[in-house]
Amino acid sequence: MEDLKKTVDDINSRDDIEFVIMAGDVTEFGADWELEAAHEIFEELDVPYYIVPGNHDTKWSESGCNSFARIFGGTDFAFESHGILFCGTSSGPNMRMGMAQVPRESIIWLDSLISATPDGMPIIYTNHNPMDASLSNVAEVYDVLKKGNIQLTLAGHWHTDNLKNYDGVPAIVGRSTLRSTPPSKVVGYNIITIDTTTMHLTVRNHESGGKDGKVWAEVDMKPFDPSIQTTRPDYSLNEKYPNATTVWEKQETADIGSGFASDGTRLFYATAAGEIKSIYARTGGDVWSYKTGGRIYSFPAYSAGRVVCASTDGNVYCLNAKNGRLIWVHPTGKGIVACPLVEEGVVYVGSSAGEFYAIDLMSGDRKWTFDGVKGFIEARAVADDEKVYIGSWGNEFYALDRKDGTLVWKWNNTGSRMYSAAACWPVISGDKVFITTPERATRALDKNTGEEIWFSKEPNGRESQGISLDGKELYVKTMLTNELVAVDAVADTCKIVWKCPLPNDQDMDLAPAPIMSNSNAVFVPSSIGKVYAVSRDGSRVIWAKKLSNTVINHIMPLDEKTVVASTMDGKIVCISYTEN
């Protein structure tokens, strides 16, 4: 925060700056206290400022991305100055690791904004992520921006100064304010000057407390040429696997950041806009919808005719599965991004208040609270007859007594909290509980003591893992080598059973979604909208299908020949397949 304060003081010492645009990453971890501290400094500016969140503000957000909007007044902005429209949107990824993605709600807002902008008005657009292929839905954003006279995009993320041109649109990727920014290694910022007579734009670096640097970028603004084509994702994969066909598809108006539960007839899911919904599994037809008071990144759970889901408004909701009517609501006092587990009439779920709860499914009464959680909880717990197991974004993993919530043991992953066992869903087999953490390490912990039975980086997974139906194999999706790895879950060492290459041309795959299976296939998610079905023996990819260019949240088998999947940009797709 010291570097930001020095930057603000320097800006206030000048009389030639009209406004400030901050292109995201105002925090390291998106914690409420970090956002509040940054906001306090920004509020000291003597000129207006406009801000969008970056990936560090949204990926690890304990509030489910609510606090940024609450503290700064929103995640998108638009204003006019000297006949130019300046606008900006968030680019996430919100809560789920993957490529950046402008939320669907923001694209809809941006489209309405550009449609209402006078013809020919120059547009300068800000997004934390550069407008290249690392922004998963960049083509959709350009489709909107190119309806108007887009002149320039501004971005951060790289922490260094770059002048680029993406799909015919000049792009300024600017330095951070941090003194660690190369090559200068001093606190600073960029000053953009626009001559509105000649429409000539210059960018110079300024060292806080020092002199203006030389101009390092120049852009001549002129009417955008709409004949320049936009680069689009490649969907040719779908032609290679005709044995996988779409049964039905549904597009939400908001992002989806979670997966499904089912009663066999209906599917239950939630949107980032805060709605819990039910649709028919075989047709995708709407059944009911229930609106909560916050955003939702929680997977619903189904049991005994009831649907349980948590919201970032701080409540756990229990709804009638048939009609969506509220049965009970359980307040926790702080936002929840965790996914509930229901076992034997008890709901187990963590929150962002440093707590983990057991709630009676029938009454909604709290049975016990464990208040020793460091950080916040994101994943779904796993339970055996005696204990429930869950990790947190405080580098800790807990085994709690199911009867009273007593801490049985605690494991700690030393080092950065970004290596926490928090996004992976833990799985159990025999006397082991398995976790895969972001330093690309997989561990088997003793369920009774928490001691490491084995540790290995050979599976090369980041967070996405699952267990076979018979509990004999642990599945891990690799981060860098585009493979599904099966590990012997019975052995007391990391014994690789097989590796199956996946038809993925990305340099890395970060999607944290759990790996599911049925009797004939293992279903593997990706961060670029691809779904893979791998044979149970790992000998081949049965089929693969690209649904989107964004993160796959969940792939749930409906039967032995049908699955349903959701994508971060709000798609739900039902797929039927054969084993040809």
Give the positions of each predicted feature.
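Binuclear metal-dependent phosphoesterase catalytic core
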Residues: 162, 169-237
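Blade-level signature of beta-propeller repeat domains, shared across WD40, Kelch, NHL, RCC1
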Residues: 547-580
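N-terminal active-site segment of His-dependent metallophosphoesterases
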Residues: 1-37, 118
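Extracytoplasmic beta-rich repeat domains
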Residues: 241-261, 287-301, 328-343, 352, ...
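Extended active-site neighborhood of metal-dependent phosphoesterases/phosphodiesterases
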Residues: 32-111, 115-119, 140-152, 162-174, ...
